[in-house]
């Protein structure tokens, strides 16, 4: 803790990697993110509400914000140790290198949810685009991959190069994982309607239950 406090007090630079991943629900983006961060102590937050970072510890090297907003985003995405909240007490210091956001929303809409302006010329919005690798999960179940839409441009050239190298390694593991995820998912797909009709024909059901079951699976819903 004292080392973390010293970094905060002396504003020691950190090569922080901020990655935003936009994708539809159930595409495996959070699972692939966790695998790409394997070996790093990671705090996983989501579900709305306050106190998201109350469990944050100095030993956390990564944070995954899963379909949720991120408080104090300007500081959390900066290249220095920071405090998680804007309050005085019970405010944990974070000196980790990875801030990953997974969302069903595009980046600009997510920023708006976090309290930023929707105007492109807003200085804080520009700062976010310079700090984040903005990505999207593209393709179908058989060929999903993480596609880079906007690279991070923050810092000196050598910092940008190292940050890009780190991102590319993250992207490689992410893509390997998400493709395996979809392959495994397709092998485990279960058609409940087909199973029941094959093993327990509708003739064995009372009429009312037969109608209810048929409507439940009507049109693939």
Functional labels for PLM-detected ranges:
Residues 28-30, 51-55, 110:
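SF2 helicase motor core recognition
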Residues 17-21, 61-65, 97-99:
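Generic beta-sheet signal
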Residues 9-13, 36, 53-57, 91-93:
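Short, conserved, surface-exposed binding loops centered on an aromatic residue
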Residues 16-38:
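Glycine-rich phosphate-binding P-loop
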Residues 1-15:
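N-terminal pre-Walker A segment at the start of P-loop NTPase domains
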């Amino acid at each position: 803790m004292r080392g973390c406090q010293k970094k905060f007090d002396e504003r020691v630079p950190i090569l922080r990697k901020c990655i935003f991943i936009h994708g539809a629900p159930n595409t495996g983006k959070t699972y692939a993110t966790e695998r790409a961060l394997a070996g790093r102590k990671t705090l996983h937050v989501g579900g709305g509400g306050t106190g998201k970072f109350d469990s944050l510890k100095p030993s956390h090297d990564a944070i995954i914000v899963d379909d949720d907003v991120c408080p104090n985003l300007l500081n959390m995405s900066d290249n220095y140790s920071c405090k998680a909240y804007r309050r005085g007490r019970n405010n944990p210091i974070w000196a980790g290198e990875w801030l990953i956001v997974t969302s069903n929303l595009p980046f600009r809409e997510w920023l708006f949810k976090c309290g930023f302006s929707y105007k492109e010329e807003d200085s804080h919005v520009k700062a976010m685009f310079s700090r984040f690798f903005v990505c999207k999960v593209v393709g179908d179940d058989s060929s999903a991959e993480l596609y880079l839409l906007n690279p991070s441009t923050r810092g000196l050239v050598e910092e940008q190069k190292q940050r890009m190298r780190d991102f590319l390694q993250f992207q490689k593991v992410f893509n390997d994982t998400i493709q395996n995820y979809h392959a495994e998912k397709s092998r485990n797909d279960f058609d409940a309607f087909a199973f029941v009709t094959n093993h327990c024909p509708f003739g064995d059901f009372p009429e009312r239950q037969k109608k209810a079951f048929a409507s439940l699976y009507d049109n693939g819903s």
